[in-house]
């Protein structure tokens, strides 16, 4: 199974990187690398994430990397990463089409 990052998830990664890079560009690169690597781990264990509490019964799951929630859905063609956001923020339901 492969990991497919949606356009929205990629936009969120860029926003995170741009924000962190304002104070520490090297840390921003490391953070994005960790998030992407964590998402890549879903290829071996797609069900390792928990069900997103804000969206019960939808099949939307999440894994955590540091302070960030990586939200995804398991599809026949692969794991679809829907969005990434800082855990203290309100859940972006528009990002997942719910």
Model-derived segments and spans:
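Basic, Lys/Arg-enriched alpha-helical interface segments
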Residues: 2-60, 94
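Enriched for short, Lys/Arg-rich terminal
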Residues: 65-68, 73-98
């Amino acid at each position: 199974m492969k990991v497919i990052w949606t356009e929205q998830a990629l936009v969120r990664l860029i926003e995170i990187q741009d924000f962190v890079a304002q104070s520490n560009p090297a840390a921003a690169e490391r953070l994005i690398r960790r998030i992407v690597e964590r998402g890549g781990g879903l290829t071996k264990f797609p069900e390792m994430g928990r069900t997103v509490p804000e969206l019960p019964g939808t099949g939307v799951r999440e894994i955590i990397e540091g302070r960030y929630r990586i939200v995804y859905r398991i599809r026949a063609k692969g794991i679809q990463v829907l969005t990434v956001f800082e855990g203290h923020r309100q859940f972006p339901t528009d990002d997942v089409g719910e």
